[in-house]
Amino acid sequence: MIEALKRTFRSLCGAALAAALFGLAATVPAPAADKVSVVAAENIYGDIAAQIGGAHVAVTSLISNPSQDPHLFEASPSAVRAIADARIVVLNGADYDPWIEKLIKSAPNPQRAVVSAAAVMGRKPGDNPHLWYDPATLPRVAEAIASVLTAADSAHAADYAANLNALTGALKRIDVRVAELRARYKGVPVTASEPVFGLMAQAIGLAMRNERFQLAMMNDTEPTAHDLAEIERDLKEKRVKALIYNAQVSELM
């Protein structure tokens, strides 16, 4: 069962991220003058914008390396310029990428539209910020992106609508897979180093343990002695069937 869960985790990551996992660019190219310029904080949202916008958009994703810690990201001068000039900026929000919110505020642009996944999903700082693992997030963010693209470039509204329809149709395959996994794994006890996969685990119906420990790790605070002892006991006594580990963290304990 553990190996099956590991394979499931990898396949869901691949499905959700689609074609978005590429190297981190050192500089940001200038968009073509006849295209709608879109800047995404993370490439998963940049990929959504590119699929909806097609040939009519120039998309720049500032974080494209899955091992990059968004909390430690420092924007290059070209990235700062790209944000200042962008017609559309897409971000995660919920304190996952606060650096881009600061850059947006420092460069006011009345023609710029901002799409925040957290705002779309009604999430706030303190909530689990890994919103793309919620199967409901990407379709709703896609709708929001299509809406602002249509407002910025109404001449290609039909193309944006068609691309949105195709994308949301493709994303329904994830819903089907999640339903299959829920039927098989609902109630299976698991734990994690951080709540990165928490929203997907919730959708699948996994019984997530040690959530206070995970929050402490995510917030870079010391877990309590009780919470530390509890996760150690769960692992040593094999009370959980899988450990979901955040590769961005060098140590679990």
Residue positions per predicted region:
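Bacterial N-terminal signal peptides
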Residues: 13-26
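Polar helix-capping/helix-linker motif
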Residues: 11-14, 134
